[in-house]
Amino acid sequence: MEKRTSYCGELNEAHIGQSVVLHGWVQKRRDLGGLIFIDLRDREGIVQVVFNPEFSKEALEIADSVRNEFVVTIKGTVHARGEKAINDKLATGKVEVLAEEITILNTSKTPPFYIEDGVNVSDELRLKYRYLDLRRPEMNNIFKMRHTVTRTFRNKLDALGFFDIETPYLTKSTPEGARDYLVPSRVYPGNFYALPQSPQILKQLLMTAGFDKYYQIVRCFRDEDLRGDRQPEFTQIDLETSFLTKEEIQAITEDMLVDVVKEAKNITIDKPFPRMTYKEAMDRFGSDKPDIRFGLELVNVSDVVKDVDFKVFQSAIENGGEVKAINAKAAAANFSRKDLDALGVFVANYGAKGLAWLKVEAGELKGPIAKFFPEEKATELKASLQAEDGDLLLFAADKADIVAASLGALRNKLGKELNLINEEELAFLWVTDWPLFEYDEEAGRYVSAHHPFTLPKEEDIPLLETDSSKVMAEAYDIVLNGYEIGGGSLRIYKKEVQESMFRALGFTDESAKEQFGFLMDALEYGTPPHGGIALGLDRIVMILAGRNNLRDTIAFPKTGSAVDPLTNAPGEVSEAQLAELKLETVKKETN
């Protein structure tokens, strides 16, 4: 096989007159009046190859037998296309290759779908034939971008003096967080390793070890319910550093992300990134990861409506809840009564018991609850919401968390439906000053908002075991276009604080020692102040590539039900394998 001289997509007018050897796949073959044209594709693009009997009759005869997705080697000369033959849709559209020789390296069955962008095919079929799906130029380009993003992160961290250190994939299962993927031990029957949800504890131990600056591009595993921006296995840009403030860690993160966006998209992002406290994010946007590319902010109108004779509002306020509203500017005409009923059904998915609404027409409030607003109250409400003719006012009344969840989700939905979002914009945001704990209704107790190793604010440490709800954390999340792309914090580095943290989470001293004794021991040997952040590589690439599902950024992903249609994983194993591991499967009885 002759050595390749160029990639197909690299050929241009500078190559005219040059002899080239190309390897690739046949994208398309056309037979036109004794001439055969082949579009040859490789990872860099497509070029047109012409087979002319006057130039090589033998090559023409072989080309006649070629079909789509055959793998071939072509030797020929680069020529300029005629003016009328120029194809502006191709990067190589001003040139073509006049073939002298063609060698068929392998044939191909007819693929189950066309290998081209925009093909209408189910996700299940794409994943079953993922190796064909990845041939499509748009998929190829995503993985070029992923390579660029990964390389840029690595180069930046190397330049900043971070050590790339690997941590083990076979670790110990620990509570808190999502479910672990467990790996049975053959040597110790009945015992299990866990695949890491993150290298959190181990990277902290590397700080105890004195490495000062660590990073790793690491695969993580979480057995959790899936959605478009989650996968059971995913990749993090993970870093940890000693003796730095959280502001310094944030500055490093910003520098990396600015470089990544410049390299991947050739877009310049201003820094420092805007900052917002967790409380402000929840109050204004109903989300701890707000998309700040558009408005539709939530406005608390409890004080305005507390005296109106509408029982839904009154009841919510009397029971310690609140009433908030969104003003969808100039959107009243966009929504019929049926549309508004559908929005009510939508917010019910987030716990809301309903969605009240008003429209502003000719200076007056119109709608089912307009009768509860006398002129003075109507004027006050319009002023508080800056409402004008044509505006649509949407209200939720309930406990604060339900109001935030329902109106926050509604805000995102309306942002898309009303075309308020500039899809080309990249809006980074730091969300800071998080509560250390959040209340888990199902468990009936407080759990870590991030993880049990997050450092409380110094002034709140005395409250850890007495008033958990008031403790604030030295934590920070980085958000991009409404997606959390990273989370970080300063870490607990003193044993007595970590012990207090575990007690606040409901651990006995004995259970904490059993689960985390190795960490507690390390904290007695001069662990330095340290902190870090983990950035979601797959999610960053998804956003930069303009996709809406993580599957498109992972070479061999799982479906929404955590199945791999390509390999049919997960699958059963043999009785012999189970016996070797001292395991039995429990069969469900059927009637």
Curated annotation (Swiss-Prot):
UniProt KW keywords: Aminoacyl-tRNA synthetase, ATP-binding, Cytoplasm, Ligase, Nucleotide-binding, Protein biosynthesis
Molecular function terms from GO: aspartate-tRNA ligase activity; ATP binding; catalytic activity, acting on a protein; nucleic acid binding; transferase activity
GO cellular component, one term: cytoplasm
GO biological process: aspartyl-tRNA aminoacylation
EC number assigned by the record: 6.1.1.12
Signal peptide positions on this chain: none
Keyword Ligase: yes
Official protein name in the record: Aspartate--tRNA ligase
Species, as recorded: Listeria monocytogenes serotype 4b (strain F2365)
Source taxonomy: Bacteria, Bacillati, Bacillota, Bacilli, Bacillales
